[in-house]
């Protein structure tokens, strides 16, 4: 362990990196483009996931709010934060995630379901907001079959074919703290 720290410090000093790089986290639900240059018109190298931890090499004011990231590339400062967004949430575990389509009826809470917003869940109160890994933020508005248990939610996708394509998946789920 000590050898790794010493080697990392030596490599960092050779490359001009500080031993204690500033850390930031992706705070964009739909991911964040890591760009070749500090501009929105620059090519995207890859898409970073919500909550991904990044080490900052440079946050010079001349970059106009962009950060140069260890490993190469730039991220727009509008879509990052200095605290881990998952520290502001309660991890509920790995849940079974199924999907449902339009029925023509309102949800159990009286609202009509909305794609990208509504989930059905029996173990959480109406209005509870959750973050589902790889999906994003959703809100409990409906209920589903009791036999599916507590570690389950049903994503409203609207179209039957989208639900069939989704199938039955397992994802990590966090409850957003109030």
Residue ranges: model-predicted function:
Residues 8-33, 47-50, 58-60, 81-92:
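SH3-family beta-barrel domains
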Residues 1-4:
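Positively charged n-region of N-terminal signal peptides that target proteins for export
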Residues 43-52, 125:
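Residue-level recognition of short, solvent-exposed, well-ordered loop/turn junctions
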Residues 41-44, 137-139:
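Surface-exposed loop/edge segments in extracytoplasmic proteins
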Residues 39-42, 118-119:
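Short, solvent-exposed loop/turn positions at domain surfaces
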Residues 59-65, 70, 78, 82-178:
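Solvent-exposed, well-ordered loop and adjacent helix/strand elements within mature globular domains
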Residues 35-37:
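Core beta-strand residues in small-molecule sensory/regulatory alpha/beta domains
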């Amino acid at each position: 362990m000590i050898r790794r720290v010493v080697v990392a410090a030596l490599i960092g000093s050779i490359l001009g990196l500080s031993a204690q790089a500033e850390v930031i986290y992706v705070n964009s639900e739909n991911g964040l483009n890591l760009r070749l240059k500090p501009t929105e018109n620059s090519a995207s190298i890859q898409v970073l996931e919500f909550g991904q931890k990044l080490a900052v090499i440079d946050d010079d004011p001349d970059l106009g709010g962009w950060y140069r990231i260890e490993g190469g590339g730039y991220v727009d400062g509008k879509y990052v934060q200095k605290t881990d967004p998952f520290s502001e949430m309660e991890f509920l575990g790995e849940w079974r995630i199924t999907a449902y389509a339009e029925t023509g009826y309102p949800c159990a809470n009286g609202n009509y379901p909305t794609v990208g917003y509504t989930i059905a869940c029996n173990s959480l109160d109406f209005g509870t907001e959750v973050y589902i890994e790889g999906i994003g933020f959703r809100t409990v508005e409906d209920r589903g079959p009791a036999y599916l248990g507590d570690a389950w939610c049903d994503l409203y996708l609207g179209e039957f074919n989208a639900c069939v394509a989704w199938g039955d998946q397992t994802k990590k789920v966090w409850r957003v703290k109030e």
